Amino acid sequence: MAKKVAVIGAGVSGLISLKCCVDEGLEPTCFERTEDIGGLWRFKENVEDGRASIYKSVITNTSKEMSCFSDFPMPEDFPNFLHNSKLLEYFRLFAKKFDLLKYIQFQTTVLTVKKHPDFSSSGQWEVVTQSDGKEQSAVFDAVMVCSGHHILPHIPLKSFPGIERFKGQYFHSRQYKHPAGFEGKRILVIGIGNSASDIASELSKNAAQVFISTRNGSWVMSRISEDGYPWDMVFHTRFKSMLRNILPRTVSKWMMEQQLNRWFNHANYSLEPKNKYLMKEPILNDDLPSRILYGAVKVKSRVTQLTETSALFEDGTVEEDIDVIVFATGYTFSFPFLEESLVKIEHNMVSLYKYMFPPQLEKPTLTCMGLIQPLGSIFPTVELQARWATRVFKGLCHLPSEKTMMEDIIKRNEKRIDLFGESQSQIVQTNYVDYLDELALEIGAKPDLISFLLKDPELAVKLCFGPCNSYQYRLVGPGQWEGARRAILTQKQRILKPLKTRSVKAAPNLSASFLMKILALVAVFVAFFSQLYGF
């Protein structure tokens, strides 16, 4: 008899978890509290309690080739960076292709998830749900928590003395939908993440003045990288990831700083991070530098005091006649249907093995999906999480002892703090390619570059120097997809398809490029084995 799996939420994590359950012969049931799929990426005009919320203009920060699921490329005519409505269209195509809707119970709220009385032997869970005012209870062999972590807003009002006297309007960024109604206002945006920079840039086109307040500053990247290709297609390659791991951090950070400052000098724009040697996630925003250059956005330091109409900043400056304050200060993790002891978040550390499994459970039958912030696309990340989790549920993959898992959690957290800092916003941040490979290794889906170099040099070059996207994890191991090789070799066509809307004479192709990459790949392996064996 197939094991029954409860999937909580029908957003991105929920949809891919459903598919992975079906792929492994499990029997999933998904509980979705709203009337439709899409989660965070389904825009609604009104903010709803208990549901993620986005503004109407949201565009993906990761490109389509780096964001698609591993055996379902996005249509080639889709733009490289997608408006939220276009991304939702892709999820609908995905759900239809793999017939996932039949597993979803819509407008059903999960009230509680508790261990079954015989959990220590069965690993089962009792899930209580509510629909149409009626409660139901069912027993499941495993649970995948896919409810997201952009729901409960974090508004640290105590950190802003005088907020109670402020006479203007203030709200969290999750309540922002569009710029209508803010024309001619003087607006203060607190925070400097992606949402803060998006909202500040958008509002500045019609507001009287926008200020953006930051404690530490931030690097800003454009979605457009070398030769006009999407940034993540250039940044996330195995070769560059290996270099970043091998080189001393001062060297790799210096190289990254030079690259980021090539677009504009961050110090001149008052954006340079205080601790620029931490590898915090940069902002992806194509408009912010221009809006600062136009004077429409002004960067300010930390707010120390608010009055009825003004804001005092750490550097002693004051801005008067503030009409609106937008708190783009992130979110707090919340899983109200789970016992607090299951997902522990203490001392800025999430006590989950590889950001997924509670280590203290006698049976590894509950996992949190997507509770991670990779320096890359979340979609391939959560897909590999789901592929691994479902194989653990099925007994095909095994977890180490609780002691070993706790040691890994502590060590991983120490490394995270060393790389990214102790900020609340970096609590689940991780390196992208390293984490994908780590999960792929668990299920036997990590490609062996040496093997491919010997039998398929053309593909090996793409694997090493090309974008590290999800197709790579369908070449070997369980769940192989026969279209993976072709998807890797033809991804450039899908990148250029929506751009080539006018006939232009093609530039000559440098035939030496392929040979140079082959030689470089061989040199990399020679250097690696020389170091390994002391040649």
Swiss-Prot record:
Chief localization: membrane
Entry's transmembrane regions: 510-530
Membrane protein topology class: Single-pass membrane protein
Binding positions (NADP(+)): T60, N61, S195, A196, S197, D198
Covalent link Glycyl lysine isopeptide (Lys-Gly) (interchain with G-Cter in SUMO), residues: K492
Residue positions, PTM N-acetylalanine: A2
Keyword set, alphabetical order: Acetylation, Endoplasmic reticulum, FAD, Flavoprotein, Isopeptide bond, Magnesium, Membrane, Microsome, Monooxygenase, NADP, Oxidoreductase, Transmembrane, Transmembrane helix, Ubl conjugation
Binding site for FAD: G9, A10, G11, V12, S13, E32, L40, W41, N61, T62
Swiss-Prot/TrEMBL cofactor(s): FAD; Mg(2+)
Gene Ontology terms for molecular function: flavin adenine dinucleotide binding; N,N-dimethylaniline monooxygenase activity; NADP binding
Entry's EC annotation: 1.14.13.-
Organ and tissue specificity: Lung.
Segments forming a coiled coil: none
Sequence similarity: Belongs to the FMO family.
Function per UniProt: Catalyzes the oxidative metabolism of numerous xenobiotics, including mainly therapeutic drugs and insecticides that contain a soft nucleophile, most commonly nitrogen and sulfur and participates to their bioactivation.
Designated name of the protein: Dimethylaniline monooxygenase [N-oxide-forming] 2
Lineage start: Eukaryota, Metazoa, Chordata, Craniata, Vertebrata
